[in-house]
């Protein structure tokens, strides 16, 4: 799972994530980090100081993130990334759009399945509580 996430960032497949690659992924998620912010993010986990993130460093970062469980605000922000029209629901189309931007080509069945798994009230979309 983490390897898959890592390869979403590592666009050229060379085994490292550069500030450029990090920026590309963040922009595809609707964020707009500055060069300095990207560098800070990399520096936080760049144990060997070579200016890029390799897979072991990525795992360290993920472990840190998971321990420091996402704040309400981070979860809300993530929800907003998916909820393109800001109507309070994530539709199959919105989910597909974000996943495609991340380079994840999903079939309609896979998207519907993801929605079904999260959709507790059965209305065919995902609200904030379900998210």
Curated annotation (Swiss-Prot):
GO cellular component, one term: centrosome
Keyword Metal-binding: yes
InterPro entries the record matches: CALM/Myosin/TropC-like, EF-hand-dom_pair, EF_Hand_1_Ca_BS, EF_hand_dom
Matching Pfam families: EF-hand_7
Domain EF-hand as annotated: residue spans: 1-32, 33-68, 70-105, 106-131
Binding locations of Ca(2+) 2: 46, 48, 50, 52, 57
Residues that, per the record, bind Ca(2+) 4: 119, 121, 123, 125, 130
Entry similarity comment: Belongs to the calmodulin family.
PROSITE patterns to which the protein is assigned, alphabetical: EF_HAND_1, EF_HAND_2
Name used for this protein in its record: Neo-calmodulin
Organism expressing this protein natively: Gallus gallus (Chicken)
Taxonomic superkingdom: Eukaryota
Keywords: Calcium, Metal-binding, Repeat
GO MF annotation list: calcium ion binding
Binding locations of Ca(2+) 3: 83, 85, 87, 89, 94
Gene3D superfamilies for this protein: EF-hand
Sites where the protein binds Ca(2+) 1: 10, 12, 14, 16, 21
